[in-house]
């Protein structure tokens, strides 16, 4: 398979920082989509894609209980995801930037555990991708 064919068939997943070690063991390329990644995250083989981070103003209103999940989602869709015409454009941008030969895919990371609402759920729905499931356990946001 050519590199271009590998790039276009890249697996994309979502996950959270607490499971980073497992994702790396399973040969996934970690990409932070948080506004601020953890200080320990800054290694040479870890990436950030701040274009998918929520805007601080509506993130803070959600965390402070001023915005409900629905209001946060509306702002995230309008102010962040609206930059892409369609999900395939965003998928291709992520693949072009981060996919490497011999990896098992790209995993988009944030802080929240699977049981808590997070913008990565909105991203996952927009891209029609899955929370990563591993042989060491299932990490599913449902």
Language-model segments: what does each one mean?
Residues 2-142:
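Residues lining hydrophobic/aromatic ligand-binding pockets adjacent to catalytic sites
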């Amino acid at each position: 398979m050519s590199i271009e064919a590998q790039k276009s068939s890249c697996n994309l997943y979502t996950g959270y920082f607490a499971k980073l070690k497992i994702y790396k063991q399973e040969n996934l390329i970690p990409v932070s989509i948080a506004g601020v990644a953890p200080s320990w995250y800054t290694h040479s083989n870890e990436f950030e894609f701040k274009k998918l981070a929520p805007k601080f103003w509506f993130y803070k209103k959600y965390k402070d209980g001023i915005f409900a999940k629905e209001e946060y989602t509306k702002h995230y869709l309008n102010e962040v995801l609206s930059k892409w015409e369609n999900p395939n454009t965003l998928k291709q941008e992520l693949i072009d930037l981060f996919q490497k030969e011999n990896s098992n895919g790209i995993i988009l990371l944030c802080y929240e555990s699977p049981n808590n609402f997070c913008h990565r759920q909105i991203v996952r729905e927009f891209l029609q991708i899955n929370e990563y499931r591993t042989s060491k356990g299932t990490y599913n946001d449902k």
